[in-house]
Regions:
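Non-catalytic interaction/regulatory segments
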Residues: 1-192
Length: 192
């Protein structure tokens, strides 16, 4: 398995630093021992800079989402207003084919001028070209063995170009991303 990568300013960069186990241990202590596998899996793909840029409350929300997505909630969307319409949007959601395109398209259509992004997945590197049917078979096998679904944790920064209040804009964005995630979770391929 290759080294994890994250996307920053359009360049895939290797993640050479790791999240300290003490952070994972603190999060598991708050969520319960049954969360250890899901939390460790999610945080194993994050760079320490991603973690350092996140507040303790945000880290707890991401850890909780690692346990709850998609069984209890379709996805977690966190929008933080930085200044003068600049926002940071962080998404924890199930991993599925073409998700990056769907998310960035929705962000753009919602009025976010994306300036940078970090993209992480617990799925590891793609095994090469797979058909949609192959992906569905792999998911069915994972489901039958009880293996947790792969997750993404993506962070985008940019400027909201609509005239809407940021809180109103964020509420609409959260609902739209949840709707898209619910549609993908149905896993109904076209033409079958």
């Amino acid at each position: 398995m290759g080294q994890p990568l994250f996307l920053r300013f359009g360049i895939l960069t290797p993640v050479s630093d790791h999240v300290p186990n003490t952070i994972i241990d603190r999060l598991v202590a708050k969520l319960g021992d049954s969360s250890r596998e899901a939390v460790t899996r999610l945080f194993s793909v994050l760079s320490s800079s991603f973690v350092q840029e996140s507040s303790p409350d945000s880290l707890l929300a991401y850890a909780r989402a690692a346990v709850d997505v998609p069984d209890r909630i379709p996805c977690l969307v966190e929008v933080v207003e930085n200044d003068d319409r600049h926002v940071t949007v962080t998404i924890v959601a199930p991993d599925y084919p073409a998700e990056f395109a769907a998310i960035t398209g929705l962000l753009s259509a919602s009025g976010l001028d994306i300036q940078s992004g970090q993209v992480h997945t617990t799925a590891g590197p793609a095994p090469g070209k797979l058909s949609y049917r192959d992906v569905r078979r792999m998911r069915a096998l994972k489901k039958s063995t009880g293996e947790r679904r792969s997750l993404i944790i993506d962070r985008f920064t940019g400027i909201v170009s609509t005239g809407e209040d940021i809180a109103v804009w964020a509420g609409k964005l959260k609902e739209r991303l949840a709707t898209i995630t619910r549609v993908y979770l149905k896993e109904r391929p076209r033409g079958e």
